[in-house]
Amino acid sequence: MRLFQLLFRASPATLLLVLCLQLGANKAQDNTRKIIIHNFDIPKSVRPNDEVTAVLAVQTELKECMVVKTYLISSIPLQGAFNYKYTACLCDDNPKTFYWDFYTNRTVQIAAVVDVIQELGICPDDAAVIPIKNNRFYTTEILKVE
């Protein structure tokens, strides 16, 4: 009986502290989903005029699908398939991989860019979202010609 009397006399701050210790910290903000996860792979070095294959793997952790446009940008002009732009529907259960084959005889810095865009006719039933915070993601690599 005396225990219950002590419990009812406890200050609100003490009760709040006990409640927080029982519930634990809120981890809702620790598990934010990543909009775009990308992995850009090119060789570190090649010989002049060797064919180079650039590979960009893209995925998302969002539950909703997005329309993405992927392309490469270089520090010097490159010709051929390097200039191809790909548009695809990216969903969490369907990652995409894009390939570019090109030639170069000079060292070049290359950026792989992923833009989240609004375009009809790409995702099923045109059901796609556009993130408010970020809609462009990129990574850069240097391709040395030796």
From Swiss-Prot:
Localization, UniProt: Secreted
Keywords: Disulfide bond, Glycoprotein, Pyrrolidone carboxylic acid, Secreted, Signal
Signal peptide extent: 1-28
Any single biological process term in GO: regulation of immune system process
Cystine pairings recorded for this chain: C65-C91, C89-C123
Presence of the UniProt keyword tRNA processing in the record: no
Modified residues (Pyrrolidone carboxylic acid): Q29
InterPro entries hit by this protein: Ig-like_fold, Ig_E-set, PIP
MF (Gene Ontology): aspartic-type endopeptidase activity; identical protein binding; IgG binding
Any single GO CC term annotated in Swiss-Prot or TrEMBL for this entry: extracellular space
Glycosylation sites: N105
Domain of life: Eukaryota
Subunit note: Monomer. Interacts with AZGP1.
Family recorded in the similarity comment: Belongs to the PIP family.
PANTHER family: PROLACTIN-INDUCIBLE PROTEIN (PTHR15096:SF5), PROLACTIN-INDUCIBLE PROTEIN/SEMINAL VESICLE ANTIGEN (PTHR15096)
Name recorded for this polypeptide: Prolactin-inducible protein homolog
